[in-house]
């Protein structure tokens, strides 16, 4: 069994969104305020924590601000139920011919009729159908919050995390034996005895004339919480003596905190399904550790799926749902595991509102060849392709190097808001001319939603190549109902040719001679010695003859533009920059 889909209505940023989830691992990616954490919180409300101690409760503030009714609703569809589970969850199975169960959760805001708010849980086809007693206990969750300071979480005297571990490992009937084992010695040191004597004498002089008092300084009766507050985590590199947690870096301290939560998964065998919710596991971790964390989580899910189910015992399945802002993590997993969460603006009764939308890559209907190409690209480049709602696709690294400096220094100079919008645009060098897979994944719709609102493609016209790349891509966007979302800008030849032809001969001469200091005669003979209209072509031949790499030339151009040298931006590049900077 696994949570197959989650429909969230009127909950925070989610007006009415359905999020599809994979049986083993789902990674929620996308921009800030896209709704990733709200999906996690919805699962926390719908299901019970594995520990039995609920930490997330509904609040009036959870109801979406622009909702027409003062409640929110969460509905989960659980799939791949076996015959035994269908029997145990019979009240939650709306259609006996399908191996699915439905559980729902509704919260109504506080009112005169319900001064504390009203929570309703239902199962099956109708939201008036109460779950059978004990059925919700079969589905649990473990929550790992985003860690900003593991030193604080592990090293303070509150003992919260240690207490959770003690409760996990210590049976209730063994608690007193444990406390006896860690209790302080009955004998008190001489210093403490002397202190008590002196305090008693002083107190006696103050109270003997009225009502004599006695006092003693001693240890309090120890409870399990007292022990938890006294215990401290220590850690060091393997082979060294563990030190106080604050001597370790935040990254490894975060991993230690994760380890203290992961051990709770051992109890997953007591539930049929445990959903492990992990928010931003990449915090303070370098890329290799990020990958190891996600690999470990995926292994937990797969091992639970491979485990043989014993008759009469829970299935013990583990399902992972993680959120991330890390391109490293999205690159490591298959795109099939990725669900893009993003915000979309729309008009509601004359008021502009934003809402979360969900785009599961696995359900876009992409061909395997397209998915493979996207997967390989993300794996190699660690690109932020899926993290923004506007993107510029370019052929190679040269355009990607030049666009930011041209935007900041020239095209958008003086337009602070436009520059910020441009900075929020993802620039994707695909190192080729096959833009189709990237346009497909960014513009193909799912339930009326798509990853990108604005997509700009910059490419060469390539007159020697059959077909028209611009028309082909525009037709593709129209097929997906997004002709307004795509802009294809082409030059007449190549990037270097267009830069020269825009009126940058003197600029390129300076740059070329910086790269090839002993080639002044070559420039004079091969560029200045030909007709003006032929010089752009001659420049291409010269840099090819000198084996000038496109990336090196682009770096040199960007450096001089940044230094303030006069430069004319080719019109098609200026159009691309302005298009990305539009509000």
Model feature map: region roles:
Residues 1-28, 33-48, 234-381, 567-568, ...:
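Switch/communication elements of ASCE P-loop NTPase nucleotide-binding domains
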Residues 48-71, 271, 303-316, 348-349, ...:
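Flexible phosphate/Mg2+-sensing switch loops adjacent to catalytic phosphate-binding sites
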Residues 78-84, 111-112, 148-151, 239, ...:
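Conserved nucleotide-binding/hydrolysis micro-motifs of P-loop NTPases
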Residues 153-156, 163-278, 299, 305-307:
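Extended helical coiled-coil dimerization/tether regions that scaffold
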Residues 315, 333-583:
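Acidic, divalent-metal-binding catalytic cores of TOPRIM
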């Amino acid at each position: 069994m696994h949570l197959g889909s989650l429909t969230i209505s009127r909950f925070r940023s989610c007006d009415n969104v359905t999020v599809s989830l994979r049986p083993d691992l789902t990674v929620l990616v996308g921009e800030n305020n896209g709704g990733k954490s709200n999906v996690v919180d919805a699962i926390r409300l719908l299901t019970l924590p594995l520990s039995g101690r609920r930490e997330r409760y509904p609040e009036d503030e959870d109801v979406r601000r622009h909702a027409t009714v003062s409640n929110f609703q969460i509905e989960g569809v659980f799939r791949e139920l076996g015959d035994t589970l269908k029997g145990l969850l019979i009240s939650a199975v709306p259609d006996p011919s399908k191996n699915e169960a439905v559980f729902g959760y509704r919260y109504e805001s506080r009112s005169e009729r319900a001064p504390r708010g009203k929570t309703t849980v239902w199962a099956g086809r109708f939201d008036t159908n109460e779950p059978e007693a004990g059925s919700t206990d079969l589905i649990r969750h473990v929550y790992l919050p985003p860690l900003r300071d593991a030193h604080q979480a592990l090293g303070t005297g509150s003992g919260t995390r240690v207490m959770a571990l003690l409760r996990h490992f210590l049976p209730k009937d063994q608690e007193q034996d444990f406390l006896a084992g860690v209790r302080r010695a009955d004998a008190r040191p001489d210093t403490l005895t002397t202190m008590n004597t002196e305090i008693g004498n002083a107190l006696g002089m103050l109270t003997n004339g009225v009502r004599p008092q006695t006092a003693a300084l001693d240890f309090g009766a120890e409870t399990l919480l007292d022990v938890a507050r006294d215990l401290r985590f220590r850690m060091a590199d393997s082979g060294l003596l563990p030190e106080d947690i604050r001597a370790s870096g935040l990254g490894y301290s975060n991993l230690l905190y994760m380890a203290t939560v992961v051990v709770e998964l051992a109890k997953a065998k007591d539930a049929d399904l445990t959903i492990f919710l992990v928010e931003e596991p990449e915090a303070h971790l370098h890329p290799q550790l990020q990958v190891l964390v996600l690999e470990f989580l995926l292994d937990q899910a797969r091992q639970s799926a491979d485990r043989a189910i014993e008759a009469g015992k829970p299935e013990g399945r583990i399902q992972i749902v993680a959120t991330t802002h890390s391109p490293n993590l999205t690159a490591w997993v298959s795109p099939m595991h990725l669900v893009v969460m993003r915000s979309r603006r729309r008009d509601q009764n004359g008021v502009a509102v934003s809402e979360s939308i969900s785009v599961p890559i696995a359900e876009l209907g992409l061909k395997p060849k397209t998915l493979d190409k996207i997967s390989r690209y993300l794996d190699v480049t660690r690109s932020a392709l899926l993290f923004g709602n506007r993107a510029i696709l370019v052929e190679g690294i040269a355009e990607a190097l030049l666009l930011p400096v041209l935007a900041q220094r020239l095209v958008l100079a003086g337009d602070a808001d436009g520059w910020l919008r441009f900075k929020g645009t993802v620039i994707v060098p695909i190192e080729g001319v096959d833009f189709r897979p990237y346009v497909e994944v960014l513009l193909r719709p799912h339930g009326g939603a798509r990853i990108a609102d604005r997509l700009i493609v910059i490419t060469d016209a390539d007159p020697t190549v059959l077909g028209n790349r611009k028309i082909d891509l525009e037709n593709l966007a129209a097929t997906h109902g997004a002709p307004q979302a795509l802009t294809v800008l082409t030059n007449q030849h190549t990037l270097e040719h267009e830069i020269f032809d825009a009126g940058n001969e003197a600029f390129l001469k300076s740059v070329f001679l910086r790269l090839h200091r002993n080639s002044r005669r070559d420039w004079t003979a091969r560029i200045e010695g030909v007709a003006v209209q032929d010089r752009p072509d001659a420049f291409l031949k010269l840099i090819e003859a000198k084996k000038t790499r496109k990336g090196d030339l682009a770096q040199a151009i960007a450096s001089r533009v940044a230094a303030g040298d006069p430069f004319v931006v080719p019109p098609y590049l200026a159009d691309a920059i302005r298009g990305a900077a539009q509000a």
